[in-house]
Amino acid sequence: MPLQQPLPATTALGRTPVLRAPQLLGDWVLWLEQRPHEKGRTTALIRRWWETDSTPLELTPAPINLRSRVHDYGGAPLTATLTEGTLQLVWVDDNDCCLWFQAWTGLNGANAQSLQAIASPQRLTSPSDSALGGGVIDHARSRWLGVIEEAGCDRLVSVALDQGHQTPVVMHQPADFAGYLALSSDGAQLAWVEWQQPSMPWDCSQLVLARLTTSGALEDCHVIAGGEPSQPQGISVFQPQWLPDGSLVVAEDSSGWWNLMRHPSAENLSSHWQRLWPMAKETAMPQWVFGMSTTAWDGDKLLAAVCDQGEWQLQRLGLDGSAERVDQPFNDLADLNASNGRAVAITSNSTTGQGLLELNLGLGTWQHTPAAAAAMEVNEISVGQPLWFDGSGGQRTHAWYYPPIGGADASSPLLVKSHSGPSSMARRGLSLAIQFWTSRGWGVVDVNYGGSTGFGRTYRERLQGGWGVVDVNDCAAAAKTLIAAKHADPNRIAIEGGSAGGFTTLACL
């Protein structure tokens, strides 16, 4: 039976802020918040680590709107660093697509209200039709390094932090696309990812390394990992990251799974990559946007978000090849960041909505600050159950099945969901949009059709040459599986999806 008071549509959709990109800065935690009540404006907030009762300070008040439009999808509109007691922010404002800079002092104070802006925000670049994003701050040369997209071309550029209305200085011209910059701690080396048409970065990409001269120019660019466009079997790389010992870590999928590899010395290219943590699990996601993060150095080990059978977990990985799972209750993880035995991420689980997770790795403690107050009691929530079935071509396929509140039988209506992407994945974190239906007596099956990520490269490549066929067959097979199990009425089946999932939805009709 449906609930006596089903979840209202106004509660299920469009009211909860979306949190992104948390970052540890000394004893402070900064994050981005996209606000539905402000027409989707994104702003940056900061408060002291672990002090959930304190009021965060909004660093970028209205009308500032943090958004990058590189490759349309954008990502990483803000770069933040803390050096010698000064907080520095560089951001892209969607109002003019310009790069802006501001700095604060007062971080020794008791709370965020003690922060004092050194000066008003300074516009670093002039308005233009170009898009900027995905940057890092080069402290040694007091500049921002990032990507500019203009006239359909990507370039790596630099922008000085002490000048206004500049034209970005071009440092490197890739063949097609570039992103995911990583600057070594000494400022002497820069790594980034490139990919070429017609590949997406999760199909085939390369990790490029270059030296920075004293003047800040790039020299001696080398491809050091990934797949060449001419190779029949693509290799994808994800999130290059420097470790304190000067080694470089990246996720790549030549094994069939996005696993982590470490290069012991980026200065000695004759040394070999070390695959220290082989596993039939994923440690990366499809790179739709800049700024994605699934790994972070916690001061002692590499902390990694790992996807296993559609669920995410945290592991601590030692440079000796050891691995241990971090005990915490959340199985949907994104935007991982860590420092000095602490970690933050955006997380949820089947009964807890999206929020900011803070972890004290030394003590093994955690706390979670939801983006919004709980909209449902735990006993009112339908928890997703793993469903494996024979999909297109008889291949084993995954979905999350949410039974209607009160239980399912052969007369229950069923909603099939086809996610976007198509390289995205159906996650298990609490979705009020799904609970809207289950609270009304509907079952919901959220299908990880062929082409979804989180299940290895072979699963992801099922859709190649078969988009509109494999995904359609998988969604239909999920519904038929539940009908055969007498969990759904064959005459009461609906399907929904947006973007790529909208195409699948229409193709199913």
PLM regions: where:
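Short glycine-enriched nucleophile-adjacent loop
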Residues: 502-509
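Cap/lid segment of the alpha/beta-hydrolase catalytic domain
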Residues: 372, 376-491, 498
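A short helix->beta-strand "capping" segment at the edge of beta-propeller domains
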Residues: 1-19, 58-63
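Beta-propeller domains
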Residues: 31-63
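Conserved beta-propeller blade repeats
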Residues: 14-28, 65-89, 128-144, 173-190, ...
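Non-catalytic accessory segments flanking enzyme active sites
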Residues: 18-21, 32-33, 42, 133, ...
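A flexible loop/linker signature enriched in serine peptidases of the S9 family
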Residues: 33-43, 66-72, 91-100, 126-132, ...
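Beta-propeller blade signature
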Residues: 45-48, 157-162, 205-213, 262-265, ...
